[in-house]
Regions:
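Helix-loop-beta element that forms the nucleotide-linked donor phosphate-binding surface
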Residues: 92-102
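Short, polar loop motifs at secondary-structure junctions
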Residues: 7-8, 85-91, 105-108
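Active-site neighborhood of phospho(di)ester-bond hydrolases with catalytic His/Asp-centered motifs
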Residues: 22-23, 51-63, 83-86, 142
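Extreme N-terminal starter segment of soluble prokaryotic enzymes
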Residues: 1-4, 19
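Catalytic core of the metallo-beta-lactamase
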Residues: 10-16, 111-142
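A short helix->loop->beta-strand "cap" motif at the edges of active sites that frequently abuts
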Residues: 18, 76-81
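Metal-dependent catalytic neighborhoods of phosphoester/phosphodiester hydrolases
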Residues: 66-76, 94
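Pre-active-site segment of Zn-dependent metallo-hydrolases
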Residues: 18-56, 68-72
Length: 142
């Protein structure tokens, strides 16, 4: 499994069978809300061209469930499984029925392409936030 940091709290996990994106934030939408939150580095444009099989949204803060970034991955596309904490799930379902939206609260397990994802407790100011754990080829990722 190749692991790539895509910025902020975002990661891409990929192998020959699956592409998983966790908490993608590839815009500057936080800056639009608060100019003190300006991005300090540029985004790698190639990250916007990824066709993920799974997107995990751990909570609904803009830097984890960014609508501008999600547009690239979900708008006018189909077949993405989106595992989202409750508040993020309520927002992301607006992209329509072309995707598989899974309510991913603490304790939820869901399997995609032979990989079981488990939502675990996360200590955060957002009380619906979760962490995610999954294993591939005898390696566990959190």
């Amino acid at each position: 499994m190749k692991v790539t940091w895509i910025g902020q709290a975002g990661f891409l996990f990929e192998n020959e069978n699956i592409k998983i994106i966790i908490d993608p934030y590839l815009s500057d939408s936080c800056y639009k809300v608060n100019p003190r939150l300006k991005r300090n580095y540029s985004v790698e444009e190639s990250f916007l061209k990824i066709n993920p099989d799974v997107i995990v949204l751990t909570h609904s803060h803009l830097d984890h469930a960014d609508p501008e970034t999600l547009d690239y991955y979900l708008k006018d596309k189909s077949g993405v499984t989106v595992l989202a904490s409750e508040n993020a799930w309520n927002k992301v379902r607006t992209y329509g029925s072309e995707h598989n939206y899974v309510l991913f609260n603490n304790g939820t397990e869901f399997t995609v392409k032979g990989i079981t994802f488990k939502a675990v407790y996360a200590c955060h100011s957002d009380n619906q936030a979760v962490g995610v754990v999954f294993s591939v080829n005898n390696k566990t990722y959190y």
